């Protein structure tokens, strides 16, 4: 290179063994014979427009539903990975201030606080007025997307629950129209007991409550036991809501615990047992209020 002197002690580099091109030739505008065509140039974008626009904001929609799982009834996928359900009954103003019995409404969450859905009672005012806590009813449970995934049916059984002829029961359907189990009260002279049955009326678990269910200042626990009642595997707990709330309303909070690997159908039937226990022991009796209204 002209004008460049190598430092002392260094010999100039030998010429390379390959021919050196003095420079890149200018591209031909009109290729001649034997020349490859020159690709067309990409047009410059118009002012204000990007050549490669970035994707716009993603529209926020409803949460994606749970994927179907083999062997799990449609809609019960949310029960697979949880071992605890918290049930909060909403307090109705008409019921609080006037004493009129209305249809119950509930919110369901997992033990971690994740919303699982809502449940709403369906019954007529005549049944609430005349039958009170023993009224026949239907409870619809919907997921956060407002899709009905579980239905509870309670028929009218007259008589006292301490008498074998007046035992209460609840049918559990999932999806609605397909029976997956029953909750059947079993007679005992001192303790409230229930059988958790599958679709074939075979007992798989039992629920045993305390002799005195009106706990003041403490939670009321119903133990979920094995079929032979040899050990406890879960619990249905009616949580104490405070003196003012317990005195003025019948809006209750429940906690349901069960093994994580329990069949989802049995989990759903235990959920139905929780609602049946609420109506049997913690709901106003017939004639408690001056009237009943629809909600």
Curated annotation (Swiss-Prot):
The residues that cross the membrane are: 266-282
| Lipid moiety-binding residues (S-palmitoyl cysteine) | 158, 160, 162-163, 165
**Modified positions (Phosphothreonine) in chain numbering:** 21
Q: Please give the GO cellular component terms listed in this UniProt entry.
A: cytosol; mitochondrial inner membrane; mitochondrion; nucleus; plasma membrane
Grouped into one coarse class, the protein's main location is: mitochondrion
Q: Where in the cell is it found?
A: Mitochondrion membrane; Mitochondrion inner membrane; Nucleus
The protein's required cofactors: Ca(2+); Mg(2+)
Q: Where is the composition biased (Low complexity)?
A: 1-11
For the motif PPxY motif, give the residue ranges: 15-18
What does the UniProt PTM comment say about this protein?
Phosphorylation at Thr-21 by PKC/PRKCD upon apoptotic stimuli enhances phospholipid scramblase activity. Palmitoylation regulates its localization to the cell membrane or the nucleus; trafficking to the cell membrane is dependent upon palmitoylation whereas in the absence of palmitoylation, localizes to the nucleus.
- Tell me a GO biological process for this protein: regulation of apoptotic process
Summarizing activity control, the record says: Activated by Pb(2+) and Hg(2+) ions.
| Keyword tRNA processing belongs to the record | no
Q: Which UniProt keywords apply?
A: Apoptosis, Calcium, Lipid transport, Lipoprotein, Membrane, Mitochondrion, Mitochondrion inner membrane, Nucleus, Palmitate, Phosphoprotein, Repeat, SH3-binding, Transmembrane, Transmembrane helix, Transport
Where does the motif SH3-binding 1 lie? 7-15
> What protein family does this chain belong to?
Belongs to the phospholipid scramblase family.
Note what the entry says on domains: The N-terminal proline-rich domain (PRD) is required for phospholipid scramblase activity.
- Name of this chain's protein: Phospholipid scramblase 3
């Amino acid at each position: 290179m002209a004008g460049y002197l190598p430092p002392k002690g260094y010999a100039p580099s030998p010429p390379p063994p390959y021919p050196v091109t003095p420079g890149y030739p200018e591209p031909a505008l009109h290729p001649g014979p034997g020349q490859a065509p020159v690709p067309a140039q990409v047009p410059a974008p118009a002012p204000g427009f990007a050549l490669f626009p970035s994707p716009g904001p993603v529209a926020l929609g409803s949460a994606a539903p749970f994927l179907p799982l083999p062997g799990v009834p449609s809609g019960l996928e949310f029960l697979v990975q949880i071992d605890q359900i918290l049930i909060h009954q909403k307090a109705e103003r008409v019921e609080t201030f006037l004493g009129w019995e209305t249809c119950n409404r509930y919110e369901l969450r997992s033990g971690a606080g994740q919303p699982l859905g809502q449940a709403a009672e369906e019954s007529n005012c005549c049944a609430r007025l005349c039958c009170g806590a023993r009224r026949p009813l239907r409870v619809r449970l919907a997921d956060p997307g407002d899709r009905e995934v579980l239905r509870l049916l309670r028929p009218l059984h007259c008589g006292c629950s301490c008498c074998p002829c007046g035992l209460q029961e609840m049918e559990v359907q999932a999806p609605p129209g397909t029976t997956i189990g029953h909750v059947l009260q079993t007679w005992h002279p001192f303790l409230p007991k229930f059988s958790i049955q599958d679709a074939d009326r075979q007992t798989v678990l039992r629920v045993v409550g305390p002799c005195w269910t009106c706990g003041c200042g403490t939670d009321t626990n119903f133990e979920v036991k094995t079929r032979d009642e040899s050990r406890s595997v879960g619990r249905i707990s009616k949580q104490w809501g405070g003196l003012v709330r317990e005195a003025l309303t019948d809006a209750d909070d429940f906690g349901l615990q069960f093994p994580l690997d329990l069949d989802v159908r049995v989990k759903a039937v235990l959920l139905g047992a929780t609602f049946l226990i609420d109506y049997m022991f913690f709901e106003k009796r017939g004639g408690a209020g001056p009237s009943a209204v629809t909600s």
